[in-house]
Swiss-Prot record:
Organism, scientific name: Arabidopsis lyrata
Taxonomic lineage of the native organism: Eukaryota, Viridiplantae, Streptophyta, Embryophyta, Tracheophyta
Pfam families: SCRL
Gene name of the encoded protein: SCRa
Localisation per UniProt entry: Secreted
Tissue distribution of the protein: Expressed specifically in anthers.
UniProt-recorded name of the protein: Defensin-like protein a
Presence of the UniProt keyword Metal-binding in the record: no
Sequence similarity: Belongs to the DEFL family.
Cysteine pairings via disulfide bonds: C33-C81, C43-C67, C51-C76, C65-C78
GO biological process: rejection of self pollen; signal transduction
Biological function: Involved in self-incompatibility.
A GO cellular-component term linked to this record: extracellular region
Signal peptide: 1-23
Keywords: Disulfide bond, Secreted, Self-incompatibility, Signal
Amino acid sequence: MRCSVLFVVSYVIMSLLISHVQGMEDQKWKKVCNLEGNFPGRCVGNGDEQCKRDLTEDGNNPSKCRCRFRAGRRHCRCIYCEVFGM
């Protein structure tokens, strides 16, 4: 009986330890998903594509861009997911 109890307790402790280590691995990675910028001009025609071109010039590769006209300038917000380690 003692042997089976010891086995069950050991199993529970090992399971908790493994799940804790996996949780710590997930926290090592960060994700940046928004890319924003202000540019001169208005959002005319296909402003979303213009935003994508403007933000691509910085070496990024954004997707799903949104153009809004604010304070006399084009405000671009794009999704740009990049995963990097700490």
